[in-house]
Amino acid sequence: MLSDLAKAEALLDEEYNGYGQIYCNNAMAQALHARVALYMQDWVSAINYSTSLIESDKFQLSSVNQTVGSENHFRYLWSNDDGYEIIWRVYLTPESYGGMLGQPFLGYNTDKVYYYPDYVPAQWVLNLYESKDLRDNAYFANAQTGHAHGLVWPLLIKYQGNASIISSYALYEVSMPKPFRLAEQYLIRAEAYCRQERPNYALAAKDLTKLRESRFESGSGTIAMNADNWMTNIANERVRELYMEGHRLQDIKRWGNLYNKGEGFTRTPQSCSLEEGSSLKRTADHYMFVWPIPRHEVEAPGSKVQQNEGY
């Protein structure tokens, strides 16, 4: 994979680097390389690649303290799928809109009156957001559901839908995936600073503070980092920023015993969740953190593939 990334970086023209790009470009390859380096615990490369993007004049964090129309830049990033920090997005149009990212979390298209969510945010996630952290307002809202009980639940509205597609087709829950954003690069570099041979918690704190200042009303959000709290701060900030963008499983898996004292994942029952599955617990070393290889691949003629442990 590293050789493929190197070839991509050499072949993809930097001329097409810029926010909101819909075609593969050099910056996207660098963003992927930074993520891969972090996963491989290559802290130096993770820092170098993320720094290249952070210091580029092509991107900047979408701030809640700047507005476009009636929305702040960060909220606009999600309602219109456009913003200065998007390194690469999967482009959708009213005529070709792909899947519905928001359907499992909202189910509003059912009757366009009430919400019928399959999943609701965990209460511990909602509790992570401080009062001036406007990611809370951009990601979550309380709304009445259309289920028989008619209860008001906290819902994920991050993928409520692209404003253009909603206005053209009255079709909700269609949002453009944004696999690479500048915000992730700050999180990558902050973690790498903490995990390198000689940790630099001051630089890590500077990166997290920079990110948080763009998300907090009036630019507050300063955070301190040290040898005792860095893991908790990194883990929590990745949840606050990247919630439901596909990073969590990989994060818990790669952190192992560093995170939550090796306790892995525990689901806590809450009022709007079903009893089944609400008591799920998986320690960091549980085999189910690695998915099974499809049976047909293991049993194919001539296959030398061995099934993952536990399956």
Language model feature labels by segment:
Residues 99-113:
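Acidic-aromatic pocket-rim loops
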